[in-house]
């Protein structure tokens, strides 16, 4: 028996303020892609790539992440834009890039931003939806979001989700990377990171470069091999020094 969604209080966000006007008339809102506006093959391609940008975020769009069977069904009119969004969120690529590298609380916030176009209202909502993930699984969570009344009222069957009524906020794809700090601390920086690639490249180029005679960098290995003995100060009091014998006498002949 699945647990019902816990109740949570709503907080004030831009999309809930009617005085901000219609999203289409807001100059800060990105172009809205609707299936009703399609009149050519290029238009349907634009809808497909807009959906990829929204679900996968712009910095994650790669050719091997494409879901060609879903694209074909959308082009043939077998599925709606809503089902296309649902399929992208349930794809293996999305699970590998987003789901597997986040805890449930952060995953809720990421999915709300990408599928509903808004942030989580508060921690209570994150907890409520995380329980849905724990009981129904991630696919059940996606179905609950895409089939919700909020999604239907905001986007319907034929509109690609977008960040609703963005005024001064930064775009979600710029403030919500695919994984959080906890995963980065656990996994660390892998050797395939571009920083290691650049470091190895320039190190190899530096080693292959012919240094001129007299260049100090030619003697770095020799300098590193030198192990001088430490000359530490002696712990002697001034009262213990024999000045008569230590200071040479001018009249004394050797």
Swiss-Prot record:
Rod-core linker protein required for attachment of phycocyanin to allophycocyanin in cores of phycobilisomes. Linker polypeptides determine the state of aggregation and the location of the disk-shaped phycobiliprotein units within the phycobilisome and modulate their spectroscopic properties in order to mediate a directed and optimal energy transfer. One of its GO terms (cellular component) is plasma membrane-derived thylakoid membrane. It comes from the Bacteria. It is found in: Cellular thylakoid membrane. GO terms for biological process: photosynthesis. It is a peripheral membrane protein. Pfam families: PBS_linker_poly. The keyword Thylakoid applies. Residues 11-191 form the PBS-linker domain. The phycobilisome is a hemidiscoidal structure that is composed of two distinct substructures: a core complex and a number of rods radiating from the core. Keywords: Antenna complex, Membrane, Photosynthesis, Phycobilisome, Thylakoid. Belongs to the phycobilisome linker protein family. It comes from Mastigocladus laminosus. This is Phycobilisome rod-core linker polypeptide CpcG3.
């Amino acid at each position: 028996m699945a647990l019902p969604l816990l109740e949570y209080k709503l907080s004030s966000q831009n999309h809930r303020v009617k005085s901000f006007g219609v999203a289409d008339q807001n100059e800060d809102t990105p172009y809205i892609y609707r299936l009703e506006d399609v009149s050519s093959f290029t238009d349907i391609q634009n809808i497909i790539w807009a959906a990829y940008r929204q679900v996968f975020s712009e910095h994650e769009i790669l050719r091997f992440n494409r879901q060609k069977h879903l694209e074909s069904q959308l082009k043939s009119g077998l599925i709606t834009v809503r089902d296309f969004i649902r399929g992208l969120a349930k794809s293996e690529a999305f699970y590998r890039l987003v789901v597997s590298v986040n805890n449930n609380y952060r995953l809720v916030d990421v999915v709300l931003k990408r599928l509903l176009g808004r942030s989580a209202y508060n921690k209570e909502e994150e907890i409520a939806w995380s329980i849905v993930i724990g009981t129904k699984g991630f696919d059940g969570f996606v179905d609950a979001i895409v089939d919700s009344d909020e999604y239907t009222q905001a986007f319907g069957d034929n509109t690609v989700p977008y960040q609703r009524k963005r005024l001064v906020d930064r775009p979600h794809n710029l403030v919500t990377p695919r994984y959080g700090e906890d995963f980065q601390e656990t996994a660390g920086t892998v050797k395939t990171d571009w920083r290691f690639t650049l470091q190895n490249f320039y190190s190899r180029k530096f080693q292959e470069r012919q240094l001129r005679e007299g260049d100090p960098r030619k003697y770095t290995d020799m300098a590193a091999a030198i192990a001088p003995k430490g000359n530490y100060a002696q712990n002697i009091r001034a009262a213990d020094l024999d000045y008569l014998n230590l200071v040479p006498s001018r009249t004394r002949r050797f």
